[in-house]
C-alpha cells in the first residue's frame, strides 16, 4: 500500500475512533477534500495534516505514525517508536 492510501486510512480510522464526521472538518477543509484524502487520492500539506490532527484531537505525528504502521501492516507501535526515539537522540546531539 502506498503512503497516500495509508495516510488516508489513518485519517479515516482516527476520525471514526473519535466519532468525528467529515463535516466536522469544515473549519479547516471541505468534506469533499477530506473524503479524497481518506481515499488516498491526494497528499495533504504539512499544514493540512496539522489542522486535521487538531480537529481529531491528536498530535500530527500520531497520525503519521499510524499511517506508516498501516502501510507496513504492523500493529505494534513499539518498534517504530523506539526507532524514532533513537533517531531523534542522534539528530539532537
Task: Show the residue positions of the predicted features.
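Helix-turn-helix DNA-binding elements, focusing on the entry/boundary residues of the two helices
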Residues: 11, 22, 31, 46-49
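DNA major-groove recognition helix of helix-turn-helix
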Residues: 29, 38, 48, 67
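Short alpha-helical DNA-recognition segment
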Residues: 18-36
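A short, Lys/Arg-rich alpha-helix, primarily the initiator
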Residues: 1-17
Amino acid at each position: 500500500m502506498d503512503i497516500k492510501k495509508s495516510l488516508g486510512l489513518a485519517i479515516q480510522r482516527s476520525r471514526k475512533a473519535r466519532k468525528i464526521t467529515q463535516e466536522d472538518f469544515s473549519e479547516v477543509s471541505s468534506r469533499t477534500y477530506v473524503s479524497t484524502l481518506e481515499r488516498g487520492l491526494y497528499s495533504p500539506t504539512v499544514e493540512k495534516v496539522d489542522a486535521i490532527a487538531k480537529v481529531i484531537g491528536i498530535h500530527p505525528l500520531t497520525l503519521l505514525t499510524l499511517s506508516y504502521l498501516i502501510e507496513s501492516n504492523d500493529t505494534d507501535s513499539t518498534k517504530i517508536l523506539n526507532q524514532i526515539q533513537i533517531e531523534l537522540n542522534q539528530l539532537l546531539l
